[in-house]
Regions:
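Conserved ABC transporter NBD signature motif
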Residues: 56-64, 71-72
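Catalytic Walker B motif of ABC-type/P-loop ATPase nucleotide-binding domains
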Residues: 151-154
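H-loop/switch region of ABC-family ATPase nucleotide-binding domains
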Residues: 187-188
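Helical segment within the ABC ATPase nucleotide-binding domain
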Residues: 166-178
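The feature captures the beta-strand-to-loop junction immediately N-terminal to the Walker
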Residues: 33-35
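Helix-to-loop junction immediately C-terminal to a conserved catalytic motif
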Residues: 48
Length: 223
């Protein structure tokens, strides 16, 4: 379980995240929404242990993340907004490269299966020839190499076509329900958020998001 308690982040005098508390159970997909600059990426960065909170605590599987950073990182898969893969390498070479950096080792067959699971079959193609959607799928596959229990996805489907979005959504649902992964997911696509997520966290002062989600039937937490 992930437990976030009264988490606050300030940059100088500006408080971006103010006393945020929530928990995530295995198998849950949580949507994070809010206007540009509301603090969604900041929250994901803090959960990924890449930034320190100003106050508050985060526990993952009962371990305090601020204290046990190294072991906590093994349980986290993080896909930032910007695609971070080698353009000149093939899909296969990228997967092998990142497998070498991962703490858990996987056979090539298993690496390939990770890509196939999300309908990415261009194994021998250079990444520079892939579409944006395929690159996002590869980024996601890379984040899964070490079999994390917590997946943090910052706009994983931005700018990609409906079919690829549906494929990624279906795969995330499968990861949550079949493998019990906890997924935190940001998107500006409210239909996608409503369709995919079990619960939704609205960040920021603007009530706009809460208002348009109110009829979704989903549990909404606002901060
Ligand atoms: N290193 C930093 N120093 C100072 N301010 C920062 C820093 N990083 C982010 N901010 C500010 O914190 C606020 C939240 O930024 P963040 O990127 O988390 O928002 P976001 O909700 O992810 O936005 P978007 O939807 O545009 O991706 C913004 O006002 C941003 O300018």
């Amino acid at each position: 379980m992930l437990k976030v308690t009264t988490l606050t982040k300030a940059y100088g005098k500006k408080t971006v995240l103010d006393q945020i508390s929530f928990s995530v159970q295995p198998g849950e997909i949580i949507g994070l929404v809010g206007e540009n600059g509301a603090g969604k990426s900041t929250l994901l960065n803090i959960l990924a242990t890449l930034q320190k909170p100003t106050n508050g605590s985060i526990h993952l599987h009962d371990k305090l993340c601020q204290k046990e950073k190294q072991s906590i990182r093994k349980a986290i898969g993080y896909v930032p907004q910007d695609i971070a893969i080698w353009e000149e390498f093939t899909v296969e070479e990228n997967m092998i490269f990142f497998e070498k950096l991962a703490w858990k080792k996987l056979e090539i067959k298993a690496l390939r299966q990770l890509c196939l699971d999300m309908a990415l079959d261009k194994w021998k193609e250079p990444v520079k020839t892939l579409s944006g959607g395929m690159k996002r799928k590869l980024n996601l596959a890379i984040s899964l190499i070490h079999d994390p229990t917590l997946l943090l996805l910052d706009e994983p489907t931005v700018g990609i076509d409906l079919k690829s979005r549906k494929e990624i959504g279906a795969y995330l649902r499968e990861l949550a329900s079949a493998q019990g992964k906890m997924i935190l997911y940001t998107s500006h696509d409210m239909d996608e958020i409503i369709h995919l997520c079990d619960r939704i966290i609205c960040i920021g002062d603007d009530p706009f998001y809460e208002e348009i989600l109110i009829d979704s039937g989903k549990e909404i937490l606002s901060f």
